Regions:
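Residue-level recognition of the GNAT/N-acetyltransferase active site
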Residues: 1-2, 109
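Residue-level detector of family-conserved "landmark" positions at structurally sensitive sites
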Residues: 10, 21, 43, 92-93, ...
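Conserved C-terminal helix/tail region of periplasmic/extracytoplasmic solute-binding proteins
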Residues: 202-265
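Bilobed "Venus flytrap"/periplasmic-binding protein-like clamshell domains
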Residues: 2-84, 98-102, 203
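Secondary-structure end/capping motifs
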Residues: 115-221
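Residues that recognize and position ribonucleotide moieties
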Residues: 53, 106, 195
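Pocket-lining segment of extracytoplasmic ligand-binding domains
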Residues: 46, 59-161, 165
């Protein structure tokens, strides 16, 4: 949010940017706004209302600096970039509301899964290995991904990526003091890596999506059953096999492939 925003109530009459209507970010921010007694609208926000608008993540920091929006919710490192440029601050971390929530996932064509499962398995193995590397070698990952890195994987500065992947303890303590982190006992990371799509997460995702304001035609959600959707959308065979290699379950801190969902505003 902008530096002058200290509470959700300060966002009434303003615009908040989201990356996509069907994003985890939209779900979480609407839950936050509703708890604060604020209504979501798509245009002309009045008192007690907040306008949500879809915006490319790369445009969000500039829009915040220009005071075109009061805040945004999106994946890193754009939040850290706003902090680094002193145009924004963290009001709340999404992982402090929905514990261990997923952000991104990997999609495969059914044709590939059916016709070349070995190739699919190799792709998933590589993704799991990369996640394990990034989880345990955070500073090195920041350097590899930075614009200063040999392959220039991202346009982001190494300092910004380090703030995301391996923030200084004093900075983390500041977040606890300001209330950006309210569940310190969850021991959440600003960004973490975990490759398994838990059934409980997927069910809650669909359930909350059905409660969320979405632009456009979305009546198809009326007939979607959370439990059935969670079962049918994910083929976990490949990631389960990948996790059985070389003690990767313990590398990700997984004792089983079952988990209870935790959502607390």
């Amino acid at each position: 949010v902008r530096p002058d925003v200290n509470a959700l109530a300060d966002l009434q009459g303003q615009t908040v940017a989201i990356p996509f209507w069907y994003s985890i970010h939209n779900i979480i921010v609407q839950q936050m706004l509703w708890q604060a007694g604020l209504a979501v609208v798509e245009k002309n926000p009045q008192a007690g209302q907040v306008r949500l608008t879809v915006m490319p993540p790369s445009d969000m920091v500039a829009a915040l600096a220009a005071k075109q929006i009061g805040g945004f919710i999106v994946a890193e490192p754009f939040n850290a970039l706003a902090e680094a440029k002193s145009v924004g601050k963290i009001l709340r971390f999404s992982g402090d509301i929905w514990r261990d929530h997923a952000c991104c996932l990997s999609m495969m064509h059914d044709h590939d899964i059916q016709s070349r499962p070995e190739w699919v398995q190799n792709v998933i193995n590589a993704l799991v290995d990369a996640a394990a590397f990034a989880k345990h070698r955070r500073a090195e990952t920041a350097e590899l991904l930075a614009k200063q890195g040999i392959r220039h994987y991202t346009p982001h500065d190494a300092k910004v990526l380090r703030a995301v992947l391996q923030p200084e303890p004093i900075v983390w303590q500041k977040y606890e003091r300001t209330g950006a982190i309210r569940h310190a006992d969850w021991q959440q990371r600003r960004v973490d890596f975990q490759p398994f799509p838990f059934q409980s997460y997927s069910e809650l995702l669909v359930k909350l999506l059905k409660e969320t304001h979405l632009a456009g035609v979305n009546t198809f959600l009326n007939d979607v059953q959370p439990e059935k959707a969670a079962r049918e959308l994910f083929d976990t065979r490949f990631v389960e096999h990948a996790l059985q290699r070389d003690g990767l379950m313990s590398s990700f801190g997984l004792q089983s492939l079952q988990r209870q969902k935790t959502f607390a505003l």
